[in-house]
């Protein structure tokens, strides 16, 4: 009898590994195809048609005098909605309201409110919004660190914690409490809660800010599950860097768009995504950072980056 070749000797379990490989390849192929189809649905076919005066004559925007908030106010006015602008500075509110009224020929209303002082404002805001048919609420107002910092070394820590929680968390809950009943009564409405990519995973040295934005994301997705069957859409918007004063970025780039470019893109995702990065390059970054990069690696990279930013800030401060 001829001696069997080693290649002909069966290896236990080799067929199992082959089948597992086929299953894995098919699974990854289907997942990639689904991502491409879903991406085309959102980024190519999305039109944002759900957002406009047909769901309510008025839109309410917090943090409305600069950056993303101002861009939302302008884009919603461009779509024919009257705008309630809520922010801290009466002078800036008057200026932005005048610009919007003259440019888009819509009605405007202003409410000056410091969201860092919650006991003083919500009764006044409720009175200011009474009897308005509010179709859209944009919870945009927010505050971050002056620079990346270790938790216990944050300047004026006790007051900073109160301020950040009141502005980034309490405002979202309270404004939703004021506006949602009217939307439910009419069976339609859109609430856009501006979170941050910093809320997608912990960001060291911006820990409190990151945690507040994670709250906004979870709050939004939970509310969407509760109220979507009643005609109200709640969306969590998680931008990466946008060229705003808050981000301290002056010049827009392809991955750091102007607020206007970002908002036009983000509004096109309403009704298509409950949780959105709002802008195609940001969506790609979000997919990479959550699907391909382990959370532990993302945290380590965030720590390294923010330690560098902190060192540069402190060096400049020392030179002044």
Curated annotation (Swiss-Prot):
Q: Which residues bind NADP(+)?
A: 56-85
Q: Does the keyword Magnesium apply?
A: no
GO BP terms: estrogen biosynthetic process; fatty acid biosynthetic process
| Pfam families, alphabetized | adh_short
Q: What is this protein called?
A: Very-long-chain 3-oxoacyl-CoA reductase
Protein's organism: Xenopus tropicalis (Western clawed frog)
Q: Where are the transmembrane segments?
A: 17-37, 189-209, 283-303
Keyword Oxidoreductase set for record: yes
- Entry keyword set: Endoplasmic reticulum, Lipid biosynthesis, Lipid metabolism, Membrane, NADP, Oxidoreductase, Steroid biosynthesis, Transmembrane, Transmembrane helix
**Class in the EC hierarchy, top level:** oxidoreductase
Q: What does this protein do?
A: Catalyzes the second of the four reactions of the long-chain fatty acids elongation cycle. This endoplasmic reticulum-bound enzymatic process, allows the addition of two carbons to the chain of long- and very long-chain fatty acids/VLCFAs per cycle. This enzyme has a 3-ketoacyl-CoA reductase activity, reducing 3-ketoacyl-CoA to 3-hydroxyacyl-CoA, within each cycle of fatty acid elongation. Thereby, it may participate in the production of VLCFAs of different chain lengths that are involved in multiple biological processes as precursors of membrane lipids and lipid mediators.
Record-listed E.C. numbers: 1.1.1.330, 1.1.1.62
Looking up InterPro entries in the UniProt record yields: NAD(P)-bd_dom_sf, Sc_DH/Rdtase_CS, SDR_fam, VLCFA-Steroid_DH
The Swiss-Prot or TrEMBL record describes its family as follows: Belongs to the short-chain dehydrogenases/reductases (SDR) family. 17-beta-HSD 3 subfamily.
Disulfide bond sites: none
Q: According to its UniProt record, in which pathway does this protein act? A: Lipid metabolism; fatty acid biosynthesis; Steroid biosynthesis; estrogen biosynthesis
In what way does this protein cross or attach to the membrane? Multi-pass membrane protein
Task: Locate the active site.
Answer: 209 (proton acceptor)
Q: Can you supply one Gene Ontology CC term for this chain's record?
A: endoplasmic reticulum membrane
According to UniProt, the reaction catalysed is: a very-long-chain (3R)-3-hydroxyacyl-CoA + NADP(+) = a very-long-chain 3-oxoacyl-CoA + NADPH + H(+); 17beta-estradiol + NAD(+) = estrone + NADH + H(+); 17beta-estradiol + NADP(+) = estrone + NADPH + H(+); 3-oxooctadecanoyl-CoA + NADPH + H(+) = (3R)-hydroxyoctadecanoyl-CoA + NADP(+)
